[in-house]
Structure formats: C-alpha cells, structure tokens
Regions:
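Conserved, structured core segments of small domains
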Residues: 1-84
C-alpha cells in the first residue's frame, strides 16, 4: 500500500537538525534500496518534506519514520493513497 507522508521541521532546532543530516541521508538511502521510500521531495526552504512510501499498514510506515534520525524534529501526517 502507498502512503504520502508530509513532514514539517520545527525551526527552533536548526543546529541539531543540520548535525543529523548525514545520518538522515544514509537512512533514507537504505529505505530507498529496500523499496520502502519511493520518492522524496524537499521544499526550497527545507522546512517541509513529502515522501511517498510503501508499507503493509500505516503503523508500519509510522515505525519506519520513527527510525529516521530527524524524526524527533518532525511534525508528521500520513495519508493512505489509492491508484487511479
């Protein structure tokens, strides 16, 4: 099942966020290789991301998101998608 994840970053944590970016990139790469992350889009000001993810359930997608180093700094919404 496909899900759209919309995540905003809390601006007060910029220094902490920047320090974790390399670990975040490595984890996203691993999730792409597993087929869990299909696409990732970042806003031009880097305050928001949209991720298309595959998962058996919304709970599974939530658990994968919680594995991201930047997850503690995110406000996340997960929306199930349906094909046209």
């Amino acid at each position: 099942m496909e899900f759209m994840v919309s995540a905003s970053f809390r601006p007060q944590n910029q220094a902490e966020i920047l320090a974790r970016v390399p670990q975040e990139q490595a984890r996203i790469k691993a999730l792409r290789e597993q087929g869990t992350v299909e696409a990732l889009y970042i806003s031009s000001d880097r305050s928001h991301v949209w991720v298309v993810m595959q998962g058996e359930s919304q709970d599974q997608v939530q658990k994968e998101l919680e594995s991201l180093p930047l997850y503690p700094y995110m406000e996340v919404a997960i929306t199930p998608l349906s094909g046209i």
